[in-house]
């Protein structure tokens, strides 16, 4: 009644402002609907479905313009083609991780369609290794623990920040590539970004994890493959 009386007694200009404020307060008091319990979509012909607890960002869909991707707010069916979907997981449990927590130290898995196939993966590797000089490339070594080739390069933008580059090939076929970045603040390597193609080479898996988990990369890659397969339905 007090709000109604105030509206009745106010001047025209102030009435508008008061009415808007009243509506805003009433809208704010409405309960926020919880997100859908599942996030689903199709990547390269395979339908995937995950608990929304894994998904820290809005999924991006192929039929959205680049300026709309990841903006969310649209209810999508599971038949919609995904452009990119990221999952935050605790390691080694692979349970949903709280990506926005300051204590989050898990892995982030991104699944995307990949029309470029092995050629595209090799081109990305060429870009990574271009940060190493010819002399550094000649000094590359095979890391037996990881089962990967390794070479140290330098960030092209920040010369004082080294980069560790990893890759593996089989019969001339690029299987996986990775790069770990140096943290000047911590004075050590900090985060790693690896990627590999799924068996049909039509989808790519990108995994970000901490430097301290590098020795477990083989297990990370293997278990993530199993996790994705268990949540995918072949179309």
Language-model segment annotations:
Residues 1-13:
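N-terminal Sec-pathway targeting helices
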Residues 20-144:
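Charge-rich, low-complexity N-terminal segments
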Residues 37-43, 166, 194-198:
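Short acidic-hydrophobic surface loop/beta-edge motif
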Residues 46, 84, 184-188, 198:
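Secreted/processed peptides and extracellular or luminal domains of membrane proteins
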Residues 139-188:
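Signature of long, low-cysteine stretches enriched in small and polar/charged residues
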Residues 190-206:
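Extended hydrophobic
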Residues 202-235:
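Surface-exposed amphipathic alpha-helical segments
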């Amino acid at each position: 009644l007090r709000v109604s009386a105030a509206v009745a007694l106010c001047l025209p200009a102030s009435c508008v402002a008061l009415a808007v404020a009243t509506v805003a307060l009433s809208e704010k008091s409405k309960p926020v609907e919880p997100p859908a319990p599942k996030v689903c979509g199709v990547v390269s012909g395979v339908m995937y479905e995950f608990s929304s607890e894994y998904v820290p960002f809005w999924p991006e869909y192929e039929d959205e313009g680049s300026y709309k991707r990841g903006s969310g707010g649209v209810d999508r069916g599971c038949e919609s083609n995904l452009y990119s979907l990221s999952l935050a997981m605790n390691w080694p449990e692979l349970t949903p991780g709280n990506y926005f927590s300051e204590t989050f130290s898990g892995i982030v898995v991104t699944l995307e369609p990949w029309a470029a196939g092995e050629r595209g993966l090799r081109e990305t590797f060429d870009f990574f290794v271009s940060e190493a000089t010819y002399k550094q490339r000649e000094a590359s070594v095979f890391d037996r623990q990881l089962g990967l080739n390794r070479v140290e390069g330098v960030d092209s933008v920040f010369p004082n920040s080294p980069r560790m580059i990893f890759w593996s090939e089989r019969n001339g076929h690029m299987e996986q590539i990775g790069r770990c970045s140096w943290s000047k603040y911590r004075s050590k390597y900090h985060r790693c970004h690896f990627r590999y193609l799924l068996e049909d080479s039509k989808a790519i898996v990108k995994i970000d994890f901490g430097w301290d988990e590098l020795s477990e990369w083989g297990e990370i890659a293997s278990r993530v493959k199993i996790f994705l397969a268990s949540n995918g339905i072949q179309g």
